[in-house]
Amino acid sequence: VSGLKTVIPSTPYDAKGLLIAAIEDNDPVIFFEPKRIYNGPFDGHHDRPVKPWKAHPLGEVEPGHYTVPFGKAVIHREGSAVTVLAYGTMVHVCEAAAEESGVDAEVIDLRTLLPLDLETIVESVRKTGRCVVVHEATLTSGFGAELAALVQAECFYHLEAPVTRICGWDTPYPYVHEWSYFPGPARIAAALTGIMEA
């Protein structure tokens, strides 16, 4: 749909700022709320309690009016070895995976899928030479395919390894086996380690 903007926040601060921006925007906006992060920044470890938002630097929501601009990604974790592109819940899972793997990964929170901050993505991938795209949707027809294609087109001569996608499996969502379907920190850490060896 022409003009449709797509928003997926990963923090309470961004959720408020992006929602106000969506309300004030003249075009239609689809606003996704990742339920897994309602109680705190879920890091993908379903067997541990979630740390509350009050312990997170972006958990506090400023009183009053403010907006977060569409099409402006934010780097949640600086790094120089590999660029990780994520949104929503996956931002926190990727941060945990980077810490656990010991890979110097730069984790970028896209915040909005349309418009997309291609400038931040390209700058990071040209710096690191590697890119891992992570999302919860299926591998086939997921937004990660578009991200991988854009990175390939814009950064081809800077890539030291193929773009890697870590996503849900190409199956209907299996509620009984949710945690084997969900791209958890172990799968992401393995991808980070693997792309460094490529």
Where do the protein language model's features map onto the residues?
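Conserved thiamine diphosphate
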Residues: 1-25, 168, 191, 196
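Residue-level detector of structured alpha->beta connecting loops
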Residues: 3, 26-27, 102, 129
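Thiamine diphosphate
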Residues: 35-198
